Amino acid sequence: MNVQRGQRAVLAALLALLAADAAAALTAAEQQIVAAVKERSGAALQFLERTVNVNSGTLNPEGVREVGRMFRAEFDQLGFTTRWVDLPPAMQRAGHLVAAREGKQGKRLLLIGHLDTVFEKDSPVQRWERKGDRIRGPGVSDMKGGDVIIVEALRALAKLHALDNTSITVVFTGDEEKPGSPLEVTRAELVSAAKRSDLALGFEGIVKDKQGRDTATIGRRASSGWMLTVTGKPAHSSGVFSESSGFGAIYEGARILNAFREQVAEPDLTFNPGAAVGGTEVSYDPAVNKGSAFGKTNVIAASFRAQGDLRYLTYEQRDRAHARMRAIVAKSLPGAKAEITFSESYPPMSPTPGNLRLLEAYSQASVDAGLGAIEALPPGQRGAGDVQFVAPYVACLDGIGPSGEGSHTNDEDLEPGSIERATIRAALLIYRLTR
């Protein structure tokens, strides 16, 4: 027993020394910021619970607006000027919340979140639920947890009057999970805010590496699409491969797709044919991602269509892929003809030197707070997000929100302690950037 007490005493002493070392790396004001965050850890989770219990699926505009009103009240209390940005009614989207304050001190910051979730009103997951040491709920980590981190980081700074004379804009979009169309309209407010800012921080959830360490995102691949249309000569199947009948549309489509696989691939570039239809008669509606086909085994296919996505990290990479794909499509088999068209959706967030400097500043804040270094997540491990629309204009850092698992599934959850950790890191980073 005495040995156990001695071991506990040594451990307590070591922890105290580590805490003292971390505190020594922070200024007196920064130590007060950390204390202010910790003081509200319980209240932050309570606020998060209230927002999670309001359904805000993208296609539930009133629910999105209600969650927006909850966050708007918090920003109003912190002295921000707030407004709701409506979108055209035909888009059937709720709109966006914007909160801003203007000053002349330090960098002008843009903080990005979103109010909507993938959990619509008919989802079986509707409420906050404790599961052991985890919390389960719709949007608890993607991304109402990130939104709460933004509010609580700013609240800690406001307590010390550290927001005075700073320029900070917060944009919470209401349709991140399923954006309205056209994107030029739905993301106009976000782009406008970026053009008035120096740096942007996105609070999507943190992704852990293979060793279980927190990372941050300095690059995200673009999301774009392609449509392949092939025509062949309809004829009796006995003549397939002949000079007069040719190979048909399905063989040509298969040749093209396989050539894409063999000749176009490179690191950080992916292209996935998500749907394909072929036969004598085909129809495909890209608006609803559905198609149909009619054909007989004794008739050479006259039509083939395939739709896919293309994800790339830089525009140079996109252009190389487009050129290779067009060259493959142009080399048609006898009796067939093909064409390919491309469409753009989310622009790339390339891993620029400015993004890397932001990561270094964020990692240093984390180290100084005793929370460990933060490494960059490989871009191929994240999907598309709102931060990509501002990446062409400012240096960006994303993925600095909460830690959770099962995003976009009925098992989406949150590690509760990650809210406090991420809030401390964010508050210190914002404080240092705005001095």
Task: Give names to the regions the model predicted.
Residues 11-21:
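Bacterial N-terminal signal peptides
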Residues 45-49, 68, 72, 151-154, ...:
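Extracytoplasmic/secreted envelope proteins and their assembly/folding machinery
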Residues 111, 131-181, 224-230, 239-263, ...:
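Alpha-helical metal-binding/catalytic segments enriched in His/Glu/Asp
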Residues 143-219, 281-288, 434:
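Acidic/histidine-rich catalytic neighborhood of metal-dependent amide-processing enzymes
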